[in-house]
């Protein structure tokens, strides 16, 4: 009975086998942030600044930023491996994923000047670009039903219409 109860509380996570060196490097960072760290952060309702900084210093949050902008230039699967390893270790990938992915908008839609100005700072952790507002009063976080729209007016202006309920990580973004 006791053995089956222990097994019921054990979580087995099977990770892919790609990017083994990356997995090991991420795991080494995660090992410095044991369960006690996360319990204290949770109890105090604090953002894990130290963890995010450690990921930044090791280049993981700039993984998808091209090398020409001081990032690692890794493929999307490598970023998934980073988050997969963070979460499997018991750390909180939610504190890191936005910094890794939001800059994709800048890569796709930013002009050359904006990329040169912002991407190196994001890659080095000098600029935090991780706030986002998805949740709306009538659609929740179902991004396929969002009603907020941005309409271009002229060459350099947009008019945004709609409502957002929360902006995640606004306090930890520049």
Tell me what each language-model feature is.
Residues 1-21:
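Intrinsic disorder at enzyme termini
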Residues 8-12, 23-26, 49, 62:
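Low-complexity, intrinsically disordered short peptide segments enriched in small/polar/basic residues
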Residues 18-32:
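A non-catalytic, amphipathic alpha-helix used as a structural packing/dimerization or gating element
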Residues 34-173:
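Glycine-rich flavin
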């Amino acid at each position: 009975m006791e053995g089956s109860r222990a097994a019921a509380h054990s979580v087995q996570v099977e990770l892919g086998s790609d990017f083994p060196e990356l997995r090991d490097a991420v795991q080494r960072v995660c090992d410095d942030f044991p369960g006690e760290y996360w319990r204290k952060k949770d109890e105090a309702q604090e953002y894990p600044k130290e963890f995010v900084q450690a990921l930044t210093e090791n280049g993981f949050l700039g993984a998808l930023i091209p090398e020409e902008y001081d990032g690692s230039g890794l493929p999307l699967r490598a970023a998934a491996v980073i988050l997969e390893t963070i979460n499997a270790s018991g750390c909180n990938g939610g504190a890191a994923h936005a910094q890794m992915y939001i800059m994709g908008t800048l890569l796709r839609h930013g002009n050359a000047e904006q990329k040169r100005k912002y991407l190196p700072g994001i890659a080095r952790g000098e600029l935090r670009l991780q706030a986002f507002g998805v949740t709306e009063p009538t659609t929740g976080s179902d991004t396929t039903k969002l009603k907020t729209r941005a309409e271009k007016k002229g060459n350099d202006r947009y008019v945004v219409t709609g409502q957002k309920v929360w902006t995640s990580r606004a306090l930890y973004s520049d």
